[in-house]
């Protein structure tokens, strides 16, 4: 017997971080979650599996229109034709209170109740599925504590949308502990809510499959579901099933040996080429390039993120626009011995360094600086106003981090001027 466990599909939610650029793969970004889900349904049919479990957040909230529901019904129809049932539990994003639009689902789709835990028995497979959907988005009670005892003689699967204790990066909906899940006596826990793949073996096998499609730079690497093989003795095998159509990657590039902007761009080019060549699939990659290290090129890089991105984008296009997209180029370098060098010079640069260090804790100075800078920004061409990353920080008043970030680059750049 085989089944697919998936969660956090977030149908029709956008991929973020690329759409503001004219060169962005707009159609791919718009349809990525659907395309990944279609791939999943195709895998379910081709395997084939005996059933599918969706452990919450099938949707990203109420639909903008009925097209999302119509698409889901169409894909469920594909499974119905080959006799594959689907068991859907709703989580915080698609809780009953969040969904204002609904459609009647095909009769091979079964949904877990919101009022109390319920059990679906698959008598021919000797499987019992236990679960409870969210009625409200802000479900903070321990739902697992109310799940029923395991059914004797059956493979018992608990379906639950939960943060699980220890996942502080996620909202603590339906909290419970790993020990509590193991103590329940089920063979397998099909969890959802946490977007990273995680698995624990013990009295029960507990799995977060991760989300189906990475949607931004914080969701890097391959994404998908899991396919589980089981028999009357329990869980026999779990394999990850990758169905995503675009992947996100963070690429750190050490510019320590670089002296100019051109050399930095060349090093980035080599790193991007290596990323593509080492990729195990032909799936497009959206990359954030982070330039690090103490480098003599630090002054040249200062404030040039937009230009850098254009340079790096040109490299990526040359490598094949269908494979590589640049999400962002971030400068995280520092000057080579900037502090010692500047302090050793008894001139205005030393005074400037002291002034900038003191400015970080001087609200009046920061307010005056913001007023002065806003005057320059408002006179700048509109293209610059929207493309220079620092301008946003200035408008929002986030001057402390700005001064701290620009100080090394400014001093390094001025130190070159005789």
Range-by-range predicted roles:
Residues 34, 38-46, 73, 144-148, ...:
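Amphipathic, non-transmembrane alpha-helical secondary structure
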Residues 57-61, 163-165, 294-296:
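A short, flexible beta-alpha/helix-coil linker loop
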Residues 55, 192, 292:
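Conserved residues at the C-terminal ends of beta-strands
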Residues 1-68, 393-399:
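N-terminal active-site segment of His-dependent metallophosphoesterases
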Residues 243-418:
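Accessory, non-catalytic peripheral segments of nucleic-acid enzymes
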Residues 2, 16, 22-23, 51, ...:
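His/Asp/Glu-rich metal-coordinating catalytic cores
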Residues 48, 126, 185, 283-285, ...:
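Short loop/turn motifs at secondary-structure junctions
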Residues 43-48, 79-83, 319-322:
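A structural motif corresponding to the C-terminal end of an alpha-helix
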């Amino acid at each position: 017997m085989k089944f697919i466990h998936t969660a956090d599909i977030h149908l029709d939610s956008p991929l973020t971080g690329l759409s503001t650029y004219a060169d962005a793969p707009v159609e791919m970004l718009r349809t990525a979650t659907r395309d990944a889900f279609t791939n999943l349904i195709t895998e379910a049919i081709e395997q084939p599996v005996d059933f599918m479990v969706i452990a919450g957040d099938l949707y990203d909230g109420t639909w903008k229109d009925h097209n999302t529901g119509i698409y889901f019904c169409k894909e469920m129809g594909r499974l119905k034709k080959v006799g594959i049932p689907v068991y859907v539990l709703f989580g915080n994003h698609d809780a009953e209170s969040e969904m204002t639009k609904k459609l009647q689902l095909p009769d091979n789709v079964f949904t877990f109740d919101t009022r109390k835990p319920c059990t679906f028995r698959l008598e021919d497979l000797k499987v019992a599925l236990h679960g409870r959907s969210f009625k409200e988005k802000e479900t903070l009670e321990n739902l697992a504590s109310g799940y029923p005892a395991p059914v004797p003689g059956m493979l018992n699967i608990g379906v639950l949308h939960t943060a699980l204790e220890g996942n502080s990066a996620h909202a603590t909906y339906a909290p419970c502990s790993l020990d509590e899940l193991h103590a329940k006596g089920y063979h397998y826990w099909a969890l959802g809510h946490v977007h990273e793949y995680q698995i624990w073996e013990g009295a029960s096998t507990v799995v977060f499959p991760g989300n189906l499609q990475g949607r931004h730079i914080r969701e890097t690497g391959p994404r998908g579901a899991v396919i589980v093989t089981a028999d009357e003795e329990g869980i026999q095998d779990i394999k990850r099933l990758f169905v995503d159509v675009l992947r996100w990657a963070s690429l750190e590039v050490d510019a320590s040996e670089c002296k100019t902007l051109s050399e930095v761009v060349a090093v980035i080019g080599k790193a991007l080429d290596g990323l593509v060549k080492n990729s195990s699939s032909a799936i497009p990659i959206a990359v954030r390039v982070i330039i690090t290290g103490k480098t003599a090129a630090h002054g040249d890089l200062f404030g040039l993120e937009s230009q850098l991105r254009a340079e790096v984008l040109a490299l990526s296009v040359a490598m094949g626009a269908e494979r590589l997209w640049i999400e962002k180029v971030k400068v995280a370098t520092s000057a080579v011995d900037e502090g010692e060098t500047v302090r050793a010079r008894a001139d205005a640069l030393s005074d400037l360094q002291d002034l900038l260090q003191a400015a970080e804790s001087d609200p009046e100075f920061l307010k005056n600086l913001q007023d002065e800078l806003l005057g320059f920004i408002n006179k700048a061409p509109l293209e610059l106003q929207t493309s220079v990353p620092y301008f946003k920080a200035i408008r929002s008043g986030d001057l402390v981090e700005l001064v701290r970030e620009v100080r090394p680059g400014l001093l390094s750049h001025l130190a070159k001027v005789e």
